[in-house]
């Protein structure tokens, strides 16, 4: 498909009742956009990082009853899977679109990564004020990155078995960065540029 940007209809897709109906909406309306956006951003990140990156699109295959509250694409250096590695995400809840650098609970280096971020505070202190963090990729709740929740979120990521840490930027459905396509891609690339130093630090 020709990607024209994200619209309010995409957010409404995440409100459709029922697993089968919502998944049909995701597969027909959102995933083609994810593929188009993801291919561009994967190429961009590969060039920026000097390392081949691979696109993954969430399939939600484990779900049998409840529809997913969010859906996303992921970009990672591992072709076989992304969940145990630091990775970039672009995705949707019904209330906002997110662009994250994500460390989810399957990550095998959470202790090392959290301690590095806690020690090297400048890495996160330099992020723009309009960035956000999340302690759980399955929940909509986010916090401004400089709002006093950062240290506690990193400590939880380090100390709790299913702790997570996501950092990036969120966009409400009426945000003018979401369309047209060229504006969204430009915005996403700017966000990724801010997150790349954190990504590199996490891989050290």
UniProtKB/Swiss-Prot annotation:
SUPFAM superfamilies: YktB/PF0168-like. Gene3D superfamilies: Protein of unknown function DUF1054. InterPro entries: UPF0637 (IPR009403), UPF0637_domain_sf (IPR053707). Belongs to the UPF0637 family. This is UPF0637 protein lmo1065. It comes from Listeria monocytogenes serovar 1/2a (strain ATCC BAA-679 / EGD-e).
